[in-house]
């Protein structure tokens, strides 16, 4: 049976700890999964968070969304695959471990600690953070298979990556190439395009104008502009646009006459910046400059430039390129094929060498600045050019520049040999499959995704690092390669392993090989340096592994099948794949969402997921990013500690549309906490009265209960709510779901329905009217708790256990089915009518306040003026509710006669009728009523005809003194404020009832406790109160009311000129 609640006040911490203990002791999570094991499969793929540290509000928001979806689908009957994942390789972890070990370079890693120990430390770091993050996710009430997470470091996961790369190789989509790529000089590795997107940050760099002497022409120069002086040693050409107009300008510079060539459109801007005046002496198209040779300004400092000039026809000449713009610079672009993507492409067209005299740390390997880091060389190069007379102007520019997403070092463009997935060959396939098979939430993100695919280049997947999935590429000395697709294949092809520099031949038998491998290397581990030891033989050639590891974005990109253990475990893959739903943050549109589709098209020629949703970032209240430097970071634990898990969860799903950025607000958190407190208070009210009366819904036949209109209304509303919440979740418009729930709890249930039924709950005995209210409230909770369960699982469980479970025999609210709409219960007309009733009550209450009539004092009558038929029907059908809520003896639709004063509107008459305005005004003063009633008239005045409308008059109305009015959407409420003795006596009785009830509450009396009341007050009050003694006794559960000296627990109430005493009647 229903019991009185354990906590009368909502205490999230106590409640949630209690529920957590109940779940744990009763293995509810396991039972929920067991219950749905035969349901239709639903593959929810968890995008793996990176294990670089503790979770933040954004990570929490992501997991809360996921948990809500999983709980919702489970209640719908699905057997949900809910395996959490962790992204555990990559440079961010390497960087953290390097810092912990005091290492700064790859050389130090290899020489001071060794690759094997370094990888061991990375693994320890990753596993430790996994444990921390798992506990944090559990703290948020996230129900996933925490005992069986997928980890990108597991052998079977790595093998999935090898399988995918082998498929790419077999399809001709994996190849080695020399390209200009983003390079991190600190991490000493290449970065893929998608890793750099979003990593452009403001920084200051040099901004210099430099002149290149035209060969064979005295004092004639090509004028170029650059922000990367360090690339000038690698300059091999100057690019011009074939269709632009260029000019030769005569200038006076440093005391001598010179001729500068630049784009015509930029002359004024460039000369203005430099601070010189010029005269155009010649004009030509860009294509006419093609082949013009110049003298390399650092030929002596970088002797290989002499070799290039002799060997390559187009070295140190003007070449043509469409990428040249007039947005900035001079219209002539310094071109270094070893340091620019577009430079590389045009260089290939003209047969130029790819020259990049840098090592992996971004230091020069030759020439004047050998051994110096490029950014440190910038000022030295600028000063050197100044000394040589080639520097025209040096300044600074603040611009967005790409940085390493792992260590935040400024990147450089550098030509290197790398391994590529040829995404350019499958772009169209990705877009086609995506458009046909994937549903996006919101749908406009699909366009952004498609555009990102169109703009993407080939995927550089090799990284020159340690802690990652080893590239499964083995290469012979003569350059032939073989891609290994699995551990078994590697063992089968292996002929030897190398241990500490010693080659150990392997036997032919697979089983015998495994014994030797385990004896010499230990158990299977597909990481470096374990796999580096394997020497395989293909086509009669020994092959050793290419030392690179795979881009960490590839790890997560294969998650939809690698997490299922495919291809080692085909059964799960065949049952579940592709994923039914994924959801991640906005930055993943061109990252994880992209890497998955790219990898999946390579492996399976189709998409890896059916539905995908995007959410925004969490910012602070002002809209700023949370960061240590700003001191505005709020940790998830802090929110849970202050407000509770349910509040945190609901707030994150309620505060903003999921695809927008969430500006975290403590005020908003508190607002949600109040909503849950309101829900708790309604539960306390219901369970308190139901427990006293031993209420059992099973003993009642709802067909025989005398439901009132308000009961039918709330049952209709809660059934409408099912659709609102469900549609909100299905469309990923989560705020529609949460705000519908919020408004239902606060407005419909608490502020309206409970307000309407309070008196019915107070009645003693087996009253049918009270039982109808009980049954309605119980039924509402039965539906509402199931709707709330995915959002606020703790409070839903606690209320369910006491209010609903005694009559269902279902162990947990999370084991219930998602509610189905009872179409018979929905009455849309009643819902519309009740909405008008609430507006009328609000307007009527406002009118009473203006008249300074307290709600406890009844009024004689209220008149509703309206033209709206729905309002008229509502007032008739729900008249009892209006009378009760407005404390009025009579409420009816009608018209209140008032005195109208009609005056001319000179603001309109003057401009329109000018000199005739006065005679029209005189006519309005005499006949204005007719114009008001008809709306418009054509009248003849002094022989002239005028067309008049209501715009030409001002109407002032004067109500009878005993009326006060207020407008509402649909009409107007008129309250008769005349107070008779009878009304005053009734109001005074209510005033005393409220104070006695307050005293009962202060004494913490049970609702069934009887009392004796003594009242010490004025003679006038005594006479008035005697007229309603039965009412006072009934409402306060008093056995007797005595007028005289107050006794027992006494409180003085000056506002009613009384002292009241109450004493509990002892049984």
UniProtKB/Swiss-Prot annotation:
Domain of life: Archaea
EC number: 6.1.1.5
Gene3D superfamilies noted in UniProt: 3.30.720.200, HUPs (3.40.50.620), Isoleucyl-tRNA Synthetase, Domain 1 (1.10.730.10), Valyl/Leucyl/Isoleucyl-tRNA synthetase, editing domain (3.90.740.10)
One Gene Ontology term of the molecular function aspect: aminoacyl-tRNA deacylase activity
Renumbered ranges of motif 'KMSKS' region: 625-629
Motif ('HIGH' region): 49-59
Binding site for ATP: 628
Keywords carried by this UniProt record: Aminoacyl-tRNA synthetase, ATP-binding, Cytoplasm, Ligase, Metal-binding, Nucleotide-binding, Protein biosynthesis, Zinc
Principal location class: cytoplasm
Cellular component aspect of the GO annotation: cytoplasm
Gene Ontology terms: biological process: isoleucyl-tRNA aminoacylation
Cofactor(s) this protein requires: Zn(2+)
Reactions performed catalytically: tRNA(Ile) + L-isoleucine + ATP = L-isoleucyl-tRNA(Ile) + AMP + diphosphate
Localization in the cell: Cytoplasm
Xref: SUPFAM superfamilies: Anticodon-binding domain of a subclass of class I aminoacyl-tRNA synthetases, Nucleotidylyl transferase, ValRS/IleRS/LeuRS editing domain
HAMAP family with a match to the protein in the record: Ile_tRNA_synth_type2 (MF_02003)
Family recorded in the similarity comment: Belongs to the class-I aminoacyl-tRNA synthetase family. IleS type 2 subfamily.
Subunit and partners: Monomer.
PANTHER family with a match to the protein in the record: ISOLEUCINE--TRNA LIGASE, CYTOPLASMIC (PTHR42780:SF1), SOLEUCYL-TRNA SYNTHETASE (PTHR42780)
Functional note: Catalyzes the attachment of isoleucine to tRNA(Ile). As IleRS can inadvertently accommodate and process structurally similar amino acids such as valine, to avoid such errors it has two additional distinct tRNA(Ile)-dependent editing activities. One activity is designated as 'pretransfer' editing and involves the hydrolysis of activated Val-AMP. The other activity is designated 'posttransfer' editing and involves deacylation of mischarged Val-tRNA(Ile).
Domain notes for this protein: IleRS has two distinct active sites: one for aminoacylation and one for editing. The misactivated valine is translocated from the active site to the editing site, which sterically excludes the correctly activated isoleucine. The single editing site contains two valyl binding pockets, one specific for each substrate (Val-AMP or Val-tRNA(Ile)).
Annotated protein name in UniProt: Isoleucine--tRNA ligase
Species name: Pyrococcus abyssi (strain GE5 / Orsay)
């Amino acid at each position: 049976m229903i019991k009185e609640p354990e906590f009368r006040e909502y205490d999230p911490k106590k409640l949630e700890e209690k529920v957590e203990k109940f779940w744990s002791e009763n293995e509810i999570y396991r039972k929920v999964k067991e219950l749905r094991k035969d349901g239709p499969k639903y593959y929810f793929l968890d995008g793996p968070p990176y294990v670089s540290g503790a979770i933040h509000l954004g990570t929490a928001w992501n997991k809360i969304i996921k948990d809500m979806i999983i709980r919702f689908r489970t209640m719908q009957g699905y057997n949900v695959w809910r395996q959490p994942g962790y992204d555990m390789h990559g440079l961010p972890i390497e960087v953290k471990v390097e810092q912990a070990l005091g290492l700064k370079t790859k050389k130090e890693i290899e020489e001071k600690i060794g690759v094997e120990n370094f990888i061991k430390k990375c693994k320890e770091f990753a596993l430790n953070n996994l444990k921390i993050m798992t506990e944090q996710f559990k703290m948020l009430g996230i129900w996933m298979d925490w005992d069986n997470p997928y980890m990108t470091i597991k052998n079977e996961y790595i093998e999935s990556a090898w399988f995918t790369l082998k498929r790419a190789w077999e399809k001709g989509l994996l190849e080695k190439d020399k390209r200009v790529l983003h390079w991190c000089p600190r991490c000493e590795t290449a970065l893929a395009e998608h890793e750099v997107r979003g990593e452009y940050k403001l920084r200051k760099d040099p901004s210099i104008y430099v002149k290149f002497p035209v060969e064979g022409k005295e004092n004639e120069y090509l004028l170029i502009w650059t922000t990367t002086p360090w690339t000038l040693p690698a300059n091999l050409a100057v690019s011009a646009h074939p269709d632009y107009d260029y000019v030769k300008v005569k200038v006076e510079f440093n005391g001598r006459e010179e001729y500068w060539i630049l784009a015509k459109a930029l002359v004024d801007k460039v000369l203005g910046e430099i601070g010189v005046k010029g005269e155009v002496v010649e004009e030509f198209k860009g294509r006419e400059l093609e082949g013009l040779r110049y003298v390399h300004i650092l030929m002596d400092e970088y002797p290989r430039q002499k070799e290039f000039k002799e060997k390559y026809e187009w070295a140190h000449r003007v070449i043509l390129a469409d990428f040249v713009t007039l947005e900035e610079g001079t219209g002539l672009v310094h071109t270094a094929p070893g340091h620019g993507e577009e430079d590389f492409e045009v260089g290939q067209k003209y047969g130029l060498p790819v020259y990049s005299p840098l090592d992996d740390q971004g230091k020069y390997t030759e020439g004047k600045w050998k051994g110096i880091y490029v950014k440190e060389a910038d000022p030295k190069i600028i000063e050197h050019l100044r000394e040589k007379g080639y520097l025209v102007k040096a300044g600074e520019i603040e611009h967005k520049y790409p940085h390493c997403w792992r260590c935040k070092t400024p990147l450089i463009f550098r030509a290197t040999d790398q391994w590529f997935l040829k995404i350019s060959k499958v772009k169209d396939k990705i877009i086609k499959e995506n458009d046909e098979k994937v549903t996006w939430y919101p749908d406009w993100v699909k366009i952004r995704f498609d555009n990102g695919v169109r703009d993407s280049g080939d995927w550089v997947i090799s990284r020159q690092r340690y802690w990652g999935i080893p590239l499964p590429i083995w290469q012979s000395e003569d350059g032939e390669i073989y891609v290994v697709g699995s551990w078994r294949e590697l063992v089968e092809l292996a002929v030897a392993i190398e241990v500490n520099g010693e080659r150990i031949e392997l036997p032919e038998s697979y089983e015998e090989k495994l014994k030797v491998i385990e004896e010499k290397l230990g158990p299977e581990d597909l990481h470096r340096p374990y796999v580096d030891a394997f020497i395989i033989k293909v086509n009669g050639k020994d092959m050793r592994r290419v030392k690179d590891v795979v881009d960490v974005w590839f790890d997560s990109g294969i998650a939809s099948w690698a997490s299922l253990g495919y291809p080692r475990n085909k059964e799960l893959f065949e049952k579940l794949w592709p994923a039914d739903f994924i959801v991640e943050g906005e930055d993943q549109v061109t990252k994880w969402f992209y890497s998955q589709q790219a990898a999946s098209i390579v492996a399976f020629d189709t998409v890896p997921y059916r539905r995908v949703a995007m959410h925004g970032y969490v910012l602070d209240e002002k809209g700023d990013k949370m960061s240590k430097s700003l001191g505005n970071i709020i940790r998830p634990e802090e929110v849970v500690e202050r407000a509770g898990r349910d509040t945190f969860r609901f707030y994150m799903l309620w505060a903003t549309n999921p695809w927008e950025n969430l500006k975290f607000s403590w005020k908003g958190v508190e607002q949600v906490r109040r909503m849950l407190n309101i829900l708790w208070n309604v539960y306390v009210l219901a369970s308190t009265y139901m427990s006293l009366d031993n209420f059992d819904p099973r003993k009642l036949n709802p067909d025989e209960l005398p439901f009132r209109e308000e009961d039918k209304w709330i049952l209709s509303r809660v059934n409408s709510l099912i659709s609102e919440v469900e549609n909100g979740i299905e469309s990923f418009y989560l705020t529609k779901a949460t705000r519908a729930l919020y408004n239902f709890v606060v407005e419909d249930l608490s502020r309206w329905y409970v307000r309407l039924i309070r008196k019915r709950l107070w009645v003693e005995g087996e009253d049918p009217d009270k039982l109808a209210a009980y049954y309605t409230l119980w039924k509402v909770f039965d539906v509402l708790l199931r709707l709330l369960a995915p959002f606020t699982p703790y409070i839903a469980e606690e209320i369910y256990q006491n209010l609903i479970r005694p009559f269902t025999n279902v162990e947990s609210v999370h084991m219930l089915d998602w509610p189905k709409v009872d179409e018979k219960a929905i009455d849309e007309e009643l819902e519309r009518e009740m909405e008008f009733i609430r507006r009328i009550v609000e307007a009527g209450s406002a009118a009473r306040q203006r008249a300074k009539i307290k709600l406890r004092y009844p009024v004689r009558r209220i008149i509703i003026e309206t033209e709206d038929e729905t309002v008229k029907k509502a007032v008739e059908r729900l008249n009892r509710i209006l009378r009760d809520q407005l404390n009025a003896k009579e409420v009816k639709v009608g018209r209140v006669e008032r005195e109208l004063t009609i005056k001319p509107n000179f603001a309109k008459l003057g401009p329109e009728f000018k000199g005739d305005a006065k005679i029209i005004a005189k006519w309005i003063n005499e006949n204005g009523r007719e114009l008001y009633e008809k709306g418009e008239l054509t009248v003849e005045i002094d022989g002239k005809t005028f067309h008049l409308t209501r715009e030409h008059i001002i109407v002032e109305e004067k109500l009878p003194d005993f009326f006060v009015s207020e407008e509402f959407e649909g009409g107007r409420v008129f309250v008769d404020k005349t107070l008779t003795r009878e009304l005053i006596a009734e109001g005074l009785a209510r005033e005393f009832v409220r104070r006695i009830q307050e005293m009962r509450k202060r004494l913490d009396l049970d609702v069934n406790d009887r009392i004796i009341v003594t009242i010490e007050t004025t003679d006038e009050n005594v006479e008035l109160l005697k007229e309603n003694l039965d009412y006072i006794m009934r409402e306060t559960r008093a056995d007797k009311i005595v007028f005289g000296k107050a006794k027992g627990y006494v409180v003085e109430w000056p506002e009613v000129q009384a002292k009241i005493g109450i004493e509990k009647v002892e049984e």
